[in-house]
């Protein structure tokens, strides 16, 4: 496993400074959240974006850092409503906005030599039935997966509390409809603790071969709030042992997007907590 950090937790840093900081603090992977001012795929100047992508890729390479592309920016597609629109939108034209964004993310992932693109479903509108929602989502993912296949970029789908696909069981229902070799999982350890029943480690063992990306933070049962390590109720050693047991070698990305006001402290505290559990110096 490669200890990593999500750039959504460094919103007040220039991306180049965030990458340098993470490398200096001993991180080995970066989850790059595409956002305003950070590899914005809607940059008005395509040449500027291309130059930024090359510079970021070269900087990551120079530091020997792994990387995934994250698509969870809050207001990138709609400055007035968070995480809108989504693949669950009943309006095909609005779904197409999210599809286009994900296709742009796939293109950037290819140019960055990223290991995967992480994504989620979004929330369903009131009254959406289970079968209807699964069919809508699977259909919306079709063009995205086709683009991922053309570019050779795996997708890592994240179950998210409050969204239509919130549990492993619902992911399994979607996966049955998708059945694509580039369609795998982002597992957020806090989300599993928040919403699933049973030990986190058991879920990791069940889904081990499908885990392409991991988010990690502390959390409490039933409360979707990303907490600093030690402030929640997760027992981390069995979880990390299970990830090692299933042979997971990707990024273990700390996700503390609401800690940006104290980002440097959060970066250091997170590593101080996790490094001994991972056998890092």
Please provide the spans of the model-predicted regions:
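Acidic/histidine-rich catalytic cores of soluble enzymes
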Residues: 2, 19, 29-30, 132-134, ...
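Conserved, mostly hydrophobic/aromatic
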Residues: 5, 22, 30, 60, ...
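Active-site beta-loop-alpha junctions enriched in small/polar residues
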Residues: 6-10, 35-37, 72-74, 122-124, ...
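Short, acidic/polar
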Residues: 12-22, 99-107, 197-204
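Active-site acidic/histidine proton-transfer and metal-coordination neighborhood
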Residues: 16-17, 61-65, 76-184, 264
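Catalytic domains of carbohydrate-active enzymes, especially glycoside hydrolases
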Residues: 18-36, 113
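Glycine-rich, proline-tolerant flexible connector loops at the mouths of alpha/beta enzymes
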Residues: 33-56, 121, 125
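C-terminal helical cap(s) of enzyme catalytic domains, especially alpha/beta-barrels
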Residues: 263-281
């Amino acid at each position: 496993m490669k200890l990593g950090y999500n750039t959504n937790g460094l919103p007040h840093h220039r991306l180049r400074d965030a990458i340098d900081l993470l490398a200096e603090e001993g991180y080995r992977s970066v989850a790059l959240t595409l956002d305003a001012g950070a590899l914005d795929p809607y940059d008005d100047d395509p040449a500027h974006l291309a130059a930024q992508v090359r510079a970021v890729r070269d900087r990551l390479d120079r530091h020997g850092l792994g990387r995934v592309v994250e698509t969870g920016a809050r207001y990138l597609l709609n400055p007035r409503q968070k995480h809108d629109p989504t693949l669950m939108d009943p309006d095909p034209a609005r779904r197409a906005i999210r599809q286009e964004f994900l296709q742009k993310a796939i293109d950037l992932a290819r140019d960055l030599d990223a290991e995967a693109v992480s994504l989620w479903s979004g929330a369903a509108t009131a009254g959406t039935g289970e079968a209807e929602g699964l069919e809508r989502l699977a259909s919306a993912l079709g063009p995205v997966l086709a683009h991922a296949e053309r570019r050779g970029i795996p997708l890592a789908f994240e179950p998210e509390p409050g969204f239509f696909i919130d549990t492993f069981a619902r992911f399994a229902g979607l996966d049955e409809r998708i059945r694509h070799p580039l369609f795998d999982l982002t597992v957020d350890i806090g989300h599993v603790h928040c919403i699933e029943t049973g030990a986190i480690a058991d879920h990791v063992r069940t889904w081990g071969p499908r885990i392409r990306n991991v988010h990690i933070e502390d959390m409490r049962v039933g409360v979707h709030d990303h907490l600093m390590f030690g402030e929640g109720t997760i027992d981390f050693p069995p979880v990390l042992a299970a990830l090692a047991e299933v042979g997971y070698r990707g990024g273990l990305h700390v996700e503390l997007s609401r800690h940006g006001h104290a980002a440097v402290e959060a970066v250091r505290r997170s590593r101080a907590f996790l490094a001994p559990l991972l056998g890092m110096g």
